[in-house]
Amino acid sequence: MKGDRLIVALDTPSQEQALEWVDSLPQVLWWKVGLELFTAAGSSILQALKERGKRIFLDLKLHDIPHTVGRATEVAVGYGVDLLTVHAAGGSAMLRSAVAAAQGSSCRLLAVTLLTSISPPQVRQELGIEMDPADYVLHLARLAQAQGFTGLVCSPQEVSRLRQALGPEVLLVTPGIRLGQAKAGDGDEDQQRICTPDEALRAGADYLVVGRPITASPDPVAALRRFQALWDAAS
């Protein structure tokens, strides 16, 4: 498995627990810090990861008025993170504000299209969007690309279409990765649009984001090896 293409999500409010996972899986280069951990630990978790030589995906899904998102982006890239998420649904002005704030930094902005926790029926029934989910994702992806975004977060089910439509230069980061034992909506499974690592890679994903299937496993090292086997099979 290419360790620089796997991003492990630190889904915990505890910095101590997060760093225990990081230290127990030294072969993993990329780590995702989301709202839960960032709200609990603040920038100290980012500093701890940088001290360990890790690369950081700060997944805050910024979505506010353009001025606020621009200022928040400026602060976030100042932490030295490598990837930062912004909601594409915030509109063109908001997206441009984020791009302007990140200009000159080494941070790459990723536009979030449609959360992988949202099922196709919810798109119409709850969001009121009279589009096929795949069409809606492509619409938001093109909107973000037109404002200067060069990376996207999308479900594995949309990777192939986005790759074909947007070309090889767009960075596609894919959550909703499972080993196959979890079904959408089962138990504490939030993700609705999921697939296995080999399926996502064959579809054209650049990075895979995996959280609980590794960190909540009784043996995270063994779980990582299982992902490695599927990854190698897709290579």
Curated annotation (Swiss-Prot):
Keywords: Decarboxylase, Lyase, Pyrimidine biosynthesis. GO terms for biological process: 'de novo' pyrimidine nucleobase biosynthetic process; 'de novo' UMP biosynthetic process. The active site is at K61. SMART domains: OMPdecase. Substrate binds at residues 11, 32, 59-68, 116, 178, 191, 211-212. Its EC number is 4.1.1.23. Gene3D superfamilies: Aldolase class I. It catalyses: orotidine 5'-phosphate + H(+) = UMP + CO2. GO terms for cellular component: cytosol. The keyword Lyase applies. Coiled coil: none annotated. Catalyzes the decarboxylation of orotidine 5'-monophosphate (OMP) to uridine 5'-monophosphate (UMP). Homodimer. Belongs to the OMP decarboxylase family. Type 1 subfamily. This is Orotidine 5'-phosphate decarboxylase. The lineage of its organism: Bacteria, Bacillati, Cyanobacteriota, Cyanophyceae, Synechococcales. The gene is pyrF.
